Amino acid sequence: MPATVDIRRAADRGVTTTSWLNSRHSFSFGDYYDPANTHHGLLLVNNDDEVAPAAGFDTHPHRDMEIVTWVLGGALAHRDSAGNHGVIYPGLAQRMSAGTGILHSEKNDSTTEPVHFVQMWVAPDTSGIDPGYQQHQIDDALLDGRLQIIASGMPGHDAAITIHNRYAALHVARLRTNNAVELPAAPYLHLFVAGGTLALEDAQGALSTGDAVRFAPSEGRRVTAVEPSEILVWEMHAALGSSRG
């Protein structure tokens, strides 16, 4: 099967807008449903959310899902039924394992400034695990401009936080102008431009904030920052339905 490189532009994402929320969906989510756009590899959700001051998501349930949150600006307060609570901000990675079931809320911790974050969902490779929570500060690790593994379940990975899927890993990089990184080689890879502008090797047109690229497979291509940029990269060695067992 030939390799595919599917560039998805920011303007083509699904949108949910309320009085307090502006959410842009890379995949089907909520009222936005496209049967041809439900996931890529193991990644089910890649939501780019902005929440108004003092607002947020009231307590709601999740089950059998690994949920990773990465804040781009502001501060997000988390509280769940397992007794975990905390405030996450740029440079601090968070993972919540829903497992057999968990309730949680997410609120903007500021009364004056919005909070902007990306939330990503990956199915675990084993259902019915205990709910769990982990967060870790990785700001310093991002200073060198290289891809850093911040969340992984893959054997041999030294990640800041763990996820319960041995076929998936999330990498993050903050790139200075003209810095380049080589993307991991994997059967499935999802690149999301959290901020900035980049050039993708052997592709026409720049990648801008909110754009995404879906590789199947990826083959170690390079991306170069045209301006200071931040990228989120999911490396996946299975597709939905093939990693459970």
Regions from the PLM with identified roles:
Residues 1-245:
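Jelly-roll (double-stranded beta-helix
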